[in-house]
C-alpha cells in the first residue's frame, strides 16, 4: 500500500492545496494522503499563524466527503516544534509494515531541505514527491527540474542522477526524489489572508465552508 504525507501550516488551507493533493494521489496511485497541520512550524515566527485548533477545523471542513484525503493531528498532539522526521517515524510505526510512505512537499520548501532537522535521514528513509507549479515565482527563470538539478548538485550532493526511465532522481543508498507538476492555480495562503484583511471576497479560493468559518471567527483581520 502507498500513502502520502502532506504537511504544512495550512494558514489557511485553500483549493490549491486540495487540488495538488488530489493530483498527487491519482498520479502515484496512493491509497490515502494525510494532510498534517503543523502545531509550531520551526521556520515560522510566533504570531504569523492563527491558532492550531482553527487551522485544524478549517482542514476538516475542507476535506468533508473527500475520499482518499484525511487530516492527521499527529503534529498538533506533539509538544514543541513540528519536525518532519518525527512525523515520518510516527507513520512508519502505525501504518502497515510493507507500506510505502511518500513525503509530499512544494518545490520552494524542498530547495531548503538541507536546513531541516535530520534531513539526511529523510533522504534515506522515504521517497519524496516535490510538487512544482509551472510559472511559480522561483520557476520563472528556470524550469522546476533545472532548479532541482542545481540544488541536488550544489547542496545535497550524494550523486543524484535523473532517470528518464523512472522519471525521478536516484542515488545510491537514497530514496527516489520525484518532481511532479500540478495544475498552476494562482492561489496562496498569503494572498487569502491579505484579501480577508482588506474586506474582499475569498470565494472560489477556499472551500465555501472554510470561508464561512474564517469570517465567523474573524480570522486574519
Where are these regions (language model features)?
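Nucleotidyltransferase catalytic core that binds NTPs
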Residues: 1-221
Amino acid at each position: 500500500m502507498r500513502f502520502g504525507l502532506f504537511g504544512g501550516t495550512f494558514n489557511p488551507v485553500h483549493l490549491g492545496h486540495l487540488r495538488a493533493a488530489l493530483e498527487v494521489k491519482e498520479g502515484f496511485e496512493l491509497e490515502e494522503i494525510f494532510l498534517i497541520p503543523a502545531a509550531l512550524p520551526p521556520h515560522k515566527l510566533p504570531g504569523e499563524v492563527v491558532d492550531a485548533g482553527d487551522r485544524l477545523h478549517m482542514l476538516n471542513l475542507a476535506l468533508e466527503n473527500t475520499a482518499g484525503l484525511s487530516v492527521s493531528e499527529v503534529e498538533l498532539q506533539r509538544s514543541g516544534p513540528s519536525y518532519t522526521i518525527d512525523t515520518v517515524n510516527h507513520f512508519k510505526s502505525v501504518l502497515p509494515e510493507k507500506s510505502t510512505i511518500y513525503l509530499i512537499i512544494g518545490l520552494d520548501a524542498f530547495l531548503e531541505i538541507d536546513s531541516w532537522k535530520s534531513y539526511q535521514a529523510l533522504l534515506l528513509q522515504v521517497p519524496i514527491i516535490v510538487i512544482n507549479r509551472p510559472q511559480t515565482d522561483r520557476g520563472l527563470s528556470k524550469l522546476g527540474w533545472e532548479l532541482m538539478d542545481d540544488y541536488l548538485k550544489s547542496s545535497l550532493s550524494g550523486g543524484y542522477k535523473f532517470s528518464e526511465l523512472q522519471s525521478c532522481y536516484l542515488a545510491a543508498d537514497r530514496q527516489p526524489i520525484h518532481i511532479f507538476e500540478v495544475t498552476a492555480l494562482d492561489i496562496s495562503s498569503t494572498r487569502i489572508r491579505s484579501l480577508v484583511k482588506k474586506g474582499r471576497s475569498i470565494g472560489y479560493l477556499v472551500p465555501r465552508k472554510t470561508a464561512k468559518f474564517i469570517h465567523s471567527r474573524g480570522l486574519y483581520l
